[in-house]
Structures are given as structure tokens and as C-alpha cells.
């Protein structure tokens, strides 16, 4: 793993290469609350929490979800429970695109406000923030 060495008691940060663990992962749970959506994979501590800037593509349609309508994003993601990530792309500017085995795509990007749009929690305890 490429996780940075943290100060004592702090959470280690993951690098882009660490996100490869998502390729082949099965979406096993979608949790929705007022300000975000958590996607859980492989029934293990591998999650993506999304609070803003989610783009969902399916059957030729693209929908963009900001924080005001993030609950709608959660509803869309329910259709992918049981589906696997067939491809994952991540860039150094922290944009992530997950392609699912049914052809759907999820794109996550950091926003310009300085607040996090999403967080990936990896089984080793490290996090990737975008």
C-alpha cells in the first residue's frame, strides 16, 4: 500500500494507487442520510461516502447530484447493489470514475470550495479524500 505514514494517533491517507482495491469489488450496501450517501463494497470496511459532486451515467443518461439533492443519488445507486466494479480510474487531481458491470458509471470529483466531496475508507484503515 502507498498510504502515507501518519503521526501517532492520526488516520493514514491513501494514495491513488491504493484505490485499485475497488476494481472487482461488489456493491453490497447503500446507506442514505440527509447530507450524504455511503456505498459499501464486499461486505467489508471498504466504503465511499459521497456528500457532493456525484455524476451517475446509465442507459445513455447522465445525472449530476450536488449536496441539495444527494438523496436522489442514493436512490440511483440502489439499482447497482449486487453489481461489481469492472473498471476504476483515478487521477492525481482526485477525480474517480467507477464503471460497473452493467455499463453504469459513477464519477466523483472534489469541489472547488475546499470541502471534501467524497471519502474512500479502505480496509487497512487509511482514507482517500476528494
Question: PLM features: what roles do these ranges have?
Answer:
Residues 1-130:
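Surface-exposed, interaction-prone regions used to assemble/regulate multi-protein complexes
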Amino acid at each position: 500500500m502507498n498510504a502515507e505514514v501518519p503521526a501517532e494517533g492520526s488516520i493514514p491517507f491513501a494514495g491513488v494507487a491504493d484505490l485499485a482495491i475497488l476494481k472487482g469489488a461488489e456493491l453490497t450496501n447503500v446507506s442514505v442520510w440527509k447530507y450524504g450517501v455511503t456505498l459499501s463494497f464486499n461486505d467489508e470496511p471498504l466504503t465511499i461516502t459521497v456528500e457532493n459532486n456525484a455524476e451517475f451515467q446509465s442507459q445513455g443518461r447522465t445525472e449530476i447530484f450536488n449536496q441539495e439533492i444527494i438523496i436522489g443519488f442514493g436512490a440511483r445507486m440502489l439499482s447497482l447493489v449486487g453489481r461489481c466494479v469492472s473498471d476504476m480510474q483515478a487521477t492525481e487531481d482526485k477525480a474517480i470514475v467507477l464503471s460497473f458491470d452493467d455499463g453504469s458509471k459513477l464519477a466523483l470529483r472534489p469541489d472547488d470550495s475546499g470541502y471534501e466531496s467524497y471519502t474512500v475508507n479502505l480496509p487497512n484503515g487509511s482514507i482517500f479524500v476528494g
